[in-house]
């Protein structure tokens, strides 16, 4: 696979993105197109010449004269900065020169670039950022995670169809359980949006199990959780905060109780495994479902490991040709209800 990486996007770019590209190139056969200001990227790569044989790595620098910052207006920046690293990445996919593009930068701009250059899949109303959230049984897919803070019932319906397909094909979950995030399990619970979406999801050709509450997501009751982007982003950020709090509390308790220190070598293995299960860098990035092509949006504070895994996520998503499956599923539903 050929993956275009927005090397200028992210809080720690280009250091983190170049490091991630090197990690990905060393651990796979994927070709990495490092897109950004050439002079800067060459300088970053040369920092690794003592540790790696750079000539053996399948990395190519694609020059872009501009980049989009985190605080710029997404759509405006994409329209005005046509030679930004992000725009160049999206065009590489649109022109068939890359199988996917990955960005750790301005998520709104990444979505705008995908819509502008890749276009929406026929029949899709709005694309959704579909992220992996750890739970008791393994992982849950949440859609939407922030692309659409205001939604219609029809948007949520399509999020369910797209995320269910992604969960089945890419995450290899057979007949994934799809739940609608609400304030109670009963079908009568919720607001106008969720009540209307509930009725639509019942008619979809997916394994819709009804309403689920926030606690059901980490509890492992569902494989796919559907919500608007406002709720999804709150869930994600709350989960990150709770994880950090729990790990800090564990460290604090150990410091306050010296008698437990003898067990630390044994408990550390469990804590290490726990941290790995909930660490966002293990998942890399979230696919933008609903566009003609593969766009992976990563965390702004991603390190090299997260960038590497986002590249792998892009390659895996591209391998399964999710866009074609989504188009077929949306068309099948539309024909069913006509």
Swiss-Prot record:
BP GO terms, sorted: fatty acid biosynthetic process; phospholipid biosynthetic process
Reactions this protein catalyses: a fatty acyl-[ACP] + phosphate = an acyl phosphate + holo-[ACP]
E.C. number(s) listed in UniProt: 2.3.1.274
Listed transmembrane segments: none
Gene3D superfamilies assigned: Isopropylmalate Dehydrogenase (3.40.718.10)
Key words of the record: Cytoplasm, Lipid biosynthesis, Lipid metabolism, Phospholipid biosynthesis, Phospholipid metabolism, Transferase
Record's function text: Catalyzes the reversible formation of acyl-phosphate (acyl-PO(4)) from acyl-[acyl-carrier-protein] (acyl-ACP). This enzyme utilizes acyl-ACP as fatty acyl donor, but not acyl-CoA.
Name of the protein: Phosphate acyltransferase
Species this chain originates from: Endomicrobium trichonymphae
